[in-house]
Amino acid sequence: MTELPTTVPGYNSAVAQTDSDAMRYRYTAELAGRIESTWQDNWARLQTFNVPNPVGSLAPPDGSVVPADKLFVQDMFPYPSGDGLHVGHPLGYIATDVYARYFRMTGHNVLHAMGFDAFGLPAEQYAMQTGTHPRILTEANVVNFRHQLGRLGLGHDSRRTFSTTDVEFYKWTQWIFLQIYNAWFDVAANKARPIAELIAEFDSGERRLVDGRDWATLSAGERADVIDNCRLVYRADSMVNWCPGLGTVLANEEVTADGRSDRGNFPVFRKRLRQWMMRITAYADRLLDDLDLLDWPEQVKTMQRNWIGRSSGATVLFSAILSRSDAATTEVDVEVFTTRPDTMFGVTYLVLAPEHNLVDELVATVWPDRTDPRWTYGAATPGAAVAAYRRAIVAKSDLDRQESKEKTGVFLGRYATNPATGKPVPIFVADYVLVGYGTGAVMAVPGHDPRDWDFAHKFHLPIVEVIAGSDISEAAYVGDGVLVNSGYLDGMDVATAQEAITARLESEGRGHARIEFKLRDWLFARQRYWGEPFPIIYDSDGRPHALDEAALPVELPDVPYYSPVLFDPDDADSEPSPPLAKATEWVHVELDLGDGLKPYSRDTNVMPQWAGSSWYELRYTDPHNSERLCAKENEAYWMGPRPTEHGIDDPGGVDLYVGGAEHAVLHLLYARFWHKVLYDLGHVSSREPYRRLINQGYIQAFAYTDAHGSYVPANQVFQRGDGFFCPGPDGEIEVFQEFGKIGKSLKNSVSPDEICDEYGADTLRVYEMSMGPLEASRPWATKDVVGAYRFLQRVWRLVVDERTGETRVVDTAGELDTYTLRTLHRTIAGVSQDYAALRNNTATAKLIEYTNHLTKEHRGSVPRVAVEPLVLMLAPLAPHLAEELWLRLGHTTSLANGPFPQADPAYLVDDTVEYPVQVNGKIRGRIVVAADADYDTLKTVALADDKVQQFLAGATPRKVIVVAGRLISLVI
């Protein structure tokens, strides 16, 4: 246990009220503030929440072994914005602190720390507006956040804090990038392996090139190309989301459903650029399958499953004729993925995404004879039609393209051969097909796909029935049925037909079974300044080279201008120009990569904001290690699998991770991917970063708008009758109420500092935890905070005389009365279970109920044996007050490390039991008997009950059935 100071914090300096009748030692906001400040100082000075590691700088200095019972609790760390915290932000932080404090009191070695996710676009944009360097802004914001979080009394190990912008931190972000860059995915082994092993296999002849070339005859450049194409990090000319208004590309997840940037609301355009990509798709199966191992909300698992989007089907090759002559026919295969190969006899046209890389090759120079004018987009040539169509749809989001009821498209002037029928079908481009899913080309079966039916109906294309079941002239039939109009498949059910045609395609070399995913590789470059630089340089030929690990960190240089080149938001043809390109002295370097000094240029992109948060849990385990990401012993202790505790399939990971559901896909999926690569390469022992996840709900509040829709300060609004009003420039104005988020822009934000000033931090903690289940959203109401405040005042009065400041507790020699003992131990049992299950709202309710009982039954003085357990149980919720009361009760050690009270099982069992008594199936009476009453006693008491006797009317029951502890049934 932690020794305490000899002085009593906050006690002798309590300020008397000006009202002579007021209690001098009442628990007020002022006294709460002094108590809280003093105890926070005590905890910091005495390092109360510092937790030891097995090895390294944080290991016990005396060489002792760390406790086996460990617990790693983690919050999704905050982005330190300039607005600071509002009362919605601490909800999860307080909940995890209560959880960590409870388990610390029960003897666990608890790791709970807090860092800051400090890279990102907001600081960069503010820097552009003000000329203040984003580092200065970020550091100031972090100081403010630490102050606000510090007031809440969170029991964090402050030695383990960091910001993702710290050079010592992002050195290891860059190191992880190099591990992924220098790795490849071995499909046979289903894991990542070092790229050096792949090169060795090529050198030895153990592995051959898939294109048939001889590795030994390749030039150095050709070999480098082969290897670069195998890496888990690679460059590709990919379709990206280009946002001219922000001057950068965005990941799919950073684009809204209506095709605009999530930040800034600028138009986003699909554009082909050469970008760094991470091959997350190699892990699609493992990311999907391992969800079953995780104790996560089913909603989050479903979101990840849908995002990964595994589907089974077949790849089919349609042969498109490019030219035909007497000498030869030039053809190109159009590869299509379909989940319904059984419908191939119903294919009447093909559709390619407008961005498909075959479009420019397939588009004809002239329209074929008798081309339907509706297919031409009003253009003189197919090329002109495709160009015009691409311009028309460039700003449409993927969601718009898929949900649009008005189908549009252009004929390419080419036909492809359906391998099932041997007949030609026209090839179109249309925006309802996306290049990011499957192959970016679909075989259209309008008889059995609603989107294909709409397209065929508009462009007067044939609609063929191949699944019997409905009239396809009115709408596509999407149900099950028997195959018709399908040659050798006729009469088969769907499943049988799928197997049969897939086998036929494989035998003919025109297709094969395949599993496809919606998941796309991760776009990993941003044209920004405020992010982690890439540890990549380029030679004079433009070939990338990874820096040696010894060259890390690559520090972010200071630049005079932080902005990428911004363009007209509607300029889809603009090209990105990153801010780091302006730091010419930093960009152009001379390095020796083993073949002498040569000129190189650094990569001028930066990593996305997700980079630091994809691994930060590992750094908490070993934050000062300058030699390694984290020592293996420390990672294994805090995050390694524990099959004896969690089952044989335990993947390991953080014991509890709490944060918002808005990160279900992005952050959590990326973190899982990085962690799995590190696991494959032997750097960590855990297969997953987070064993258990809980999504806290949101604290919401009312906001108010005037007649123009502008928000007005919520704290100035008052209600009169059924209306709401606030002061205006010319008197009162009516305003209109809406319910939702809390935010500065909505003018309904309440700072936790305000509540701490008015009531104290412990009151804020108790109020937020009492508002409802952690996972549920709940409305904020400042007027209700006083309820938590009064509860803490009642607890204070149980221990402290408000007039004299003396302790009211008495050391009684006798036992407590039976009812109080039973109430106490049931409270201990219930609160223990609630804390362990994060049911802090019901734990609070039980503590209030027990406090009310003591207040009512012990008006003069309270027995120590009754009040000390209350103080201990209160400690996770209101730690400052609990520490203060514990000290006033005469203890000289902190209660931060317990002991948490233990319930006596003898007081958890009822002495009596109430039985309902049925007569012929209907309850006719109730009896109360001793809990251990035997059958004969139960029968005798039931038959003697007055109400039961009325319904028996003198009859003797044929049967008396007793369901122990629940029911007595009489049958007459």
UniProtKB/Swiss-Prot annotation:
EC main group: ligase
GO cellular component: cytosol
GO molecular function, one term: aminoacyl-tRNA deacylase activity
UniProt keyword terms in alphabetical order: Aminoacyl-tRNA synthetase, ATP-binding, Cytoplasm, Ligase, Nucleotide-binding, Protein biosynthesis
Subcellular localization, as worded in the UniProt entry: Cytoplasm
Sequence motif 'KMSKS' region, location on chain: 741-745
Residues at which ATP binds: 744
Enzyme Commission number(s) from the entry: 6.1.1.4
InterPro entries (UniProt xref): aa-tRNA-synth_I_CS, Leu-tRNA-ligase, Leu_tRNA-synth_edit, M/V/L/I-tRNA-synth_anticd-bd, Methionyl/Leucyl_tRNA_Synth, Rossmann-like_a/b/a_fold, tRNAsynth_Ia_anticodon-bd, Val/Leu/Ile-tRNA-synth_edit
Transmembrane segments: none
Catalytic activity: tRNA(Leu) + L-leucine + ATP = L-leucyl-tRNA(Leu) + AMP + diphosphate
Family the UniProt entry places it in: Belongs to the class-I aminoacyl-tRNA synthetase family.
Classification via PANTHER family: LEUCINE--TRNA LIGASE, MITOCHONDRIAL, LEUCYL-TRNA SYNTHETASE
Protein name listed in UniProt: Leucine--tRNA ligase
Species: Mycobacterium leprae (strain TN)
Species classification: Bacteria, Bacillati, Actinomycetota, Actinomycetes, Mycobacteriales
